[in-house]
Amino acid sequence: MHSSLIKLGFLLLLIQVSLSHAQLSPSFYDKTCPQVFDIATTTIVNALRSDPRIAASILRLHFHDCFVNGCDASILLDNTTSFRTEKDAFGNANSARGFDVIDKMKAAVEKACPKTVSCADLLAIAAQESVVLAGGPSWRVPNGRRDSLRGFMDLANDNLPAPFFTLNQLKDRFKNVGLDRASDLVALSGGHTFGKNQCQFIMDRLYNFSNTGLPDPTLDKSYLSTLRKQCPRNGNQSVLVDFDLRTPTLFDNKYYVNLKENKGLIQSDQELFSSPDASDTLPLVREYADGQGKFFDAFAKAMIRMSSLSPLTGKQGEIRLNCRVVNSKSKIMDVVEDALEFASSM
């Protein structure tokens, strides 16, 4: 009996440790896998040779991951019989991309450091490296996240901002996930300084804004004409349009210059400057438009805040071996099975 009590006490301690939250740290892989950063960079550089927009796509993947149950790589999971993938959510279907690049990155990392780097951390690192490769700021990514054991499609539909959102709707979505500062919203929206968007997401702005039969009145007339040529009323709505008409592949502050000139591509972007409720966001748009350094600093800080949202840490979740599927047996299940075994032996 005494031996059984010792075993039970040890088991309870193990469970307590397993469910505890460890601290995210930029030095998390310094000893266990310092080469992960070089592997991420090399993989993205190779992908950029054939796909100039992949850096923007990877940043978007990380953003959409963090907005759904925290940064847990749930967006990378494929469909299973027990859950629907977040890839099928409205904000991701036929638009989220870059999964194959993350797959290649993960395979290389597993070869160099087996069972060490989580997919959640890898996506956070890849997002940072993507921004740097496009000319943007660098920051030390806090690592130590674990990967989720399932996807959350319904939560993705509830949490991801939409391109037709008003400013107040945007603020609500950001606040709901823990990003309640105006600088979070304005700086992170600056991720639209590179990359592309599909015509389908701006058709109402161009031809029937708020069911008026007219274009969005905040849209610059010359820019409206340019966009209508790229996205004709009865044209292919999958055609891609640059977010930033000035420097479409560079990560810079021209996104904010565009907003000041009423040349934001999607409604939710222009809302930061043109909405009647923009008293706290408009000054930041002007500040970032006038000073790229201020934008870069704010973006780096906001990325660190976003990437630290509700992480799985310690023994929570798992370190997936393949980012598309959960491991055959999770660490948590190991603990549960040990508990049942000890209980049955008492």
Swiss-Prot record:
Gene Ontology CC terms: extracellular region; plant-type vacuole
Alphabetized Gene3D superfamilies for the sequence: 1.10.520.10, Peroxidase, domain 2
Keyword tags: Calcium, Disulfide bond, Glycoprotein, Heme, Hydrogen peroxide, Iron, Metal-binding, Oxidoreductase, Peroxidase, Pyrrolidone carboxylic acid, Secreted, Signal, Vacuole
Any one Gene Ontology BP term: negative regulation of growth
Binding site for Ca(2+) 1: 65, 68, 70, 72, 74
Binding site for heme b: 192
Signal peptide: 1-22
Residues of the site described as Transition state stabilizer: 60
Residues that coordinate or bind Ca(2+) 2: 193, 244, 247, 252
Active-site feature positions: 64
Keyword Iron: yes
CDD domains reported for this sequence: secretory_peroxidase
Residues binding substrate: 161
Subcellular location: Secreted; Vacuole
Domain of life: Eukaryota
This enzyme's EC code(s): 1.11.1.7
Catalytic activity of the protein: 2 a phenolic donor + H2O2 = 2 a phenolic radical donor + 2 H2O
Cysteine disulfide partners in this protein: 33-113, 66-71, 119-323, 199-231
Cofactor requirement: heme b; Ca(2+)
Leading EC class: oxidoreductase
Remarks, miscellaneous: There are 73 peroxidase genes in A.thaliana.
Family: Belongs to the peroxidase family. Classical plant (class III) peroxidase subfamily.
Reported function: Removal of H(2)O(2), oxidation of toxic reductants, biosynthesis and degradation of lignin, suberization, auxin catabolism, response to environmental stresses such as wounding, pathogen attack and oxidative stress. These functions might be dependent on each isozyme/isoform in each plant tissue.
The protein's name in its UniProt record: Peroxidase 37
